[in-house]
C-alpha cells in the first residue's frame, strides 16, 4: 500500500496514465447501461484470451502496465456482471442503487431528509395549522464484499511460458491452465453477484420486523395512543394472537378459498409504510403501473402465490443503469471502474487490452455517451407480478442464488414451538356430562364405565398422523426419580424467606405431649382444658387449608399457599425451640418459627383443594369396578344403626366386656346372638357393626344362631373387606420382598406392618414388628412415656382397677398357627382387614358420627355385677328368672339397661354364660398407645427428612356411634369417655357429652379437631386431615355412596414412594396427582418477506484488487465497499414464516428419563435403587446401569436407537400438577408452570430481576394472565417448589440442552428475565420508531434485537406453550371437527370424566391431523 491507501497496482496505474488527467475532454458524468452476463463471458473466452493471459507476465516483473490492465479488466468485468444480474432480480425494486467510487475513502456518511408534515384546514373557532417539516438524519452502514482467486506456481509458469519446452504436452498443459484460470475467474467474480443478492437480502431481513410485531404496533399507532401499560398489554395480546393466526398462514388457508391467501399477504403488505422515495418510479409493470414492492420467498411459496392469485404480468421494465454519486472521476481508471464510459464489456475488453502507454483517446471508446444523454435507460426483464389488493408486487424466489454455496437461504429456517397438555386432570362435577346430554348419576354403582374414572392417558397425533399416547407409566422416569422426592435443600432455602415469620406456628401441627402417669380420662381433660382456654382457637393448619375450595386455596390471599411447594410433603411452621415430647398440651413457642416438612406417606394426604373429594370418590369407583360393593339392604341396615340415637348402650357394655377376645365371644355367643336378633327385629339394624372383631366373629360363628337375612349382611361386610383387600393386590406388581417388606407393604399404607389399627384388643401387630424391622425404628409409648409390656401368659385372676398398669394382656395363643407365629392370635391378613375396616369402611359409613372412647372397666364390671340372675341352675327355666322380668328390673341394674334398650330376646342362660366368661378375663384400663415409626425403605433418599410418624391407638377401647344424650335413665359418661385417636373418630357431640362435667367446650369452634396431642400431632400422622374431612364432606353431601367413599379412602392410602408409584403407574391406577406434559418440536419453514419499493439506498464503491505471493502461488483478492441507508419514515419491510416445509421432530411421545438426563440423586438403599432401575428400564442395564458406589446412580448417556424413521425424537417432560387444576387453563396458550412470567407490560419499561422474580414467585399477587388466582399449579410455580427444583437450571440439576429440556426456558429465572427484557425492548424500540421519525441513529427502522425470536421461538419470548389436539379418550376423536370450520356444529369436548382439547397453536389447520378425521 502506498501513502494514499491504495494498492501497488493502483499506484502504478496512476503513474501510467498520469497524462490522462490533463486531457481537455473529460468523460461525461452519466451512467452506463449493461449487458447480459453470458455475452461478457463469451467475450472473455473467445476474444480476449491472448491479451488476457499475457497480463500475467506482470507478476514476473516484465511490464508494470500489465498489472494495471489486469486490475482494470477485473474491475470492469465484475462491475458489469454484478449489477446487471442484480438489476434483473426483484430485490432491485426495494433499492436505489448508486455508484459511489470514493466510498472506500468515506468512513462516515450521513443522509438528511426533509419531510413535509401533512396539514388539515380547520373550520371556524379552530386554530389553523401552519406548515411544518421534519428533518431526518440517518447514518449509513458500511461493509466490504470480498472474494479471492488463487493461481498456483506451476500454473503461473505455464501461463508465462517459463515451463514451456516446445512439446505438445506442455502446450496442452498451458491450455488447461488457461481454461482452469478462466473457470476460477468466473466463479470468483460470480460470487459478487451472489454476494450482492445475499447482502441486500440480509439488509432487508434485518430491517423487516415480523408481522406479529409490526401489525399490532401499526394498529395502535394509527389510533395515536400513548404507549402506556394498557396499550402495551393490548399490543402484546395482539402479538400473541397474530403469531397463532399468521404463522404458516399459507398452509392454513391453502385448503380453503384462495382469497384467504390474498388476505394474509395483504396483512403483510399493509403493516409497512412507504419510503421517502416512494414518489420516484423506477420499476413499472404493464401499462406503466408502478410496482409497489417485492415479495421475496422460496420457490414453493412463490408457486402457491402465483397459482392462487394468478399472474398479472411476467415482465417488468427495470432500470438498465445505476445512479451516480461521485466526488471526482477525471482519470480513465476511475472512469472505467465506475462504469461511466462502458456500454458493454465486450468493448471494454477490446479497448483495454489493445491500448499502449500515452495513446488512449476518447475516440477509442465509440459508445461513450455524450452530453445530454442522461435520460434513464431501462430494459425489460422476466419478473412475476401479482396483484394483492390495490398493490402490484413482484414475487421473487432467490434460492437458486444459494444453490451449492454452503450458505443457507436466509428465508428458510427453523421454528421451535413448545406444546403442553394435561394428563390425569379431573373435571368438576358440573362438566361431566354425556355426549348425548344425559347425566349418569354418581350413585349408580352398577353402571361400570371406564369413562367415569379419572383419565390416566392422553392421546394425540404425531407428524405422520399416527395416534400416539402418553400415560402415567411414561412419567416413571420423572416421578420415581430421587430428585422428585427430596425436600431438605428446599427447606433450607424456604426458611430464609421473610414471610415465614408473618404467621405464628399452629401448636396442634407439631405438639406431641408427653404422656403422664395420670389416667387417660384425666389427660384428655387436660388437653381439652388447654384448647378451651387458648386465647385464639388453636386450629391446625390442615383444618384451615382443607376447608377451602380450590379457588380459595389458589387465591393470592391464601396465607398457606406459599407452604404448598411439594406434592409429597407437608411443609409447616414449627417452633425452633420445640421439645418432643412436650410437657404442655399445646406447645407455646418462644423463639422465632422456622419451617419443617413431613412426608405425605399416601396420596390421600394431599390437601382437598388440590385433590378434591369428588375426584377421590371417582377413583374409588375405579378400585371398586371389579370388586364387591355393599348392597342397598346392607347399606340401609348399617345406616339405620349408625343414625340410631337410641342404639343400646348395653351393646357397648357387652362389647367392652368381650374386648375382642374370641374365647370370650364363643362363651358369650348366645347373648350376642340374642342382642343381634333383638335389634334386627326391633330396629332393622345391625348390632356391633362398629367393631371389626365382633363382625368377624359373628360372621364365622353365628350363622346358625342369627336370622339368615341378618347374618348375610354381616357376611356381606366381610366380603366387601376382602374385596377391598384384593384391590390392593390388583394394583401391585408381583415381585420379591424388598428389605423384609413385601411389594404390597411397600405399595399400600394399610399393608404396612408399622401402621397399627386404631383399636386393638390383642398384641398381634406389636408381636410382628418387634425385632423384625430395625430400620423402621418402631417404638410404642404409653402412660408415663414408657414402653408397654406384652404379656403372653394367662390372664390375671383379678384386675387391679386402682393401679395404672402398662402391661398389655395378650394371653397365650389358642391356635396352632398362633403358636407358630410367635404368639399371635390371628394371621397378618386379619390385621390388614382390621385396618381396612377402621380406616376405610367404617369411616365411609359413619360420616364422622363416631368417636373412639376409653372404657371405665371398673364401672362396667360393677354394672354387669348388678345383674339379677337365678340363684341356681334349676331356676333358669322359671318365668321369674327371665332377666327382663319386672321383678328383675332394679334401678341402675344391667337388667334395666337391657330392658330400656329394647333387647327383648335375652334369657338368663345367655347372661349367666356372658357374666361368667367376662369375670375370667377382666381388663383394668383402656391404654392409649402412641406408635412411632419411620417410613418404609422405598421412601428413603439422602434429601428426604427422617421423620418419625406417630399414630394413636387405643388398647381395649371401642368405637361409639351415638351418645345416648336423650336417655335420662343412664349417664353413659360413667362408663365411657371420649378419647379420639384420629380425625375419623372424633365426634364433637360425644367429646362434649363425655367431658361436660370437667370442661366447657362451648367457645371452642365446631370444626376444631379434638384429637389429643399425647396421641400424636397432625404433621406426623400417617393418615391426615384430608382423608378425615373428605370422608365427612363427601358422605354428608350425598354425592357418592358409602361404598365409593370407602374405596376412595383405600385408593388414597396408596403410598407416594418411588417404589409404590412404580406399582401404581404400571398397573394403570391414577396416582392421585396429575401431570403437565410439555414437548418442544422443531419445524423447518419457508418465510415470505415484503419490502416497499425504494426503501433502501444502496451504495457501491469502486472495486479494487490486491495480489500477493503466498506459498509459491499468487493470491488475488477483489474488494468492493458497500453501504446502505434506510429510506423509510417507518418500517418499510416485514416478514413471516408462511409455509411449513418440514416437521423436523417426530411430534411423538418419547418421555424424558431423568435418570439419563439429570444428576440422579441418591437412594439410601442399594436394593431400592436396583428395583427402580429394573422396573423403569425393564432390566436394560445400559440405559441405567447398576450404581457403584451402591447408593448412587451415576449419569451415563442412554443408548441410541439404531436408526430414526420419523425425524428427530421430541422429548416430553412432566410437571406434577394438582388434579383440581383448571382444565380450561390448558385450552389456550399458557405457561406450563401454572403462572405467567411475562412482565414486558409492567409500569417499568425495562424489566429487572426483581420484577421478574415477583412475577414468577410472588404468590401474594394475582397471576397477570389469570387474575382470579395466584397460580394453577403451586407445585411448579413457586420458588423452591418441586418443579422449580427439577427444571430450574440455576439449581444445577439440568445437564441437557434446552431443546431436550423444553421446560428449562420456562423455569429458569435468568432465561425468563432475558426473554422479558427482549420482549420489553421490542415493544419499546418498535413503538419509539413507529411514533417518531426524528433522530440520528444508525439503525433507525431496523428490526429490534430479538424480534427474530417472535417467529423462531415465540414460546420462549412470550413465556407460553400452546395446546395441541389431544383427548383423554380416543373415541372423542371420532366426532371431532376442526373448530375453525365447525363452529356451532356441535364439536364435542366432553364425555363424563373424559375431555378433548382443541389445537390452539399456530399449527391449527396446518397438519392433516388437526382437521376432521
Swiss-Prot record:
<dbReference type="GO" id="GO:0042025">
    <property type="term" value="C:host cell nucleus"/>
</dbReference>
<dbReference type="InterPro" id="IPR000912">
    <property type="entry name" value="Herpes_MCP"/>
</dbReference>
<dbReference type="InterPro" id="IPR023233">
    <property type="entry name" value="Herpes_MCP_upper_sf"/>
</dbReference>
<keyword id="KW-0167">Capsid protein</keyword>
<dbReference type="GO" id="GO:0039622">
    <property type="term" value="C:T=16 icosahedral viral capsid"/>
</dbReference>
<dbReference type="GO" id="GO:0005198">
    <property type="term" value="F:structural molecule activity"/>
</dbReference>
<comment type="similarity">
    <text>Belongs to the herpesviridae major capsid protein family.</text>
</comment>
<protein>
    <recommendedName>
        <fullName>Major capsid protein</fullName>
    </recommendedName>
</protein>
<keyword id="KW-1147">T=16 icosahedral capsid protein</keyword>
<keyword id="KW-0946">Virion</keyword>
<comment type="subunit">
    <text>Homomultimer. Makes the hexons and eleven out of twelve pentons. Interacts with triplex proteins 1/TRX1 and 2/TRX2; adjacent capsomers are linked together in groups of three by triplexes, heterotrimeric complexes composed of one molecule of TRX1 and two molecules of TRX2. Interacts with scaffold protein; this interaction allows efficient MCP transport to the host nucleus. Interacts with capsid vertex component 2/CVC2. Interacts with the small capsomere-interacting protein/SCP.</text>
</comment>
<dbReference type="Pfam" id="PF03122">
    <property type="entry name" value="Herpes_MCP"/>
</dbReference>
<comment type="function">
    <text>Self-assembles to form an icosahedral capsid with a T=16 symmetry, about 200 nm in diameter, and consisting of 150 hexons and 12 pentons (total of 162 capsomers). Hexons form the edges and faces of the capsid and are each composed of six MCP molecules. In contrast, one penton is found at each of the 12 vertices. Eleven of the pentons are MCP pentamers, while the last vertex is occupied by the portal complex.</text>
</comment>
<keyword id="KW-1048">Host nucleus</keyword>
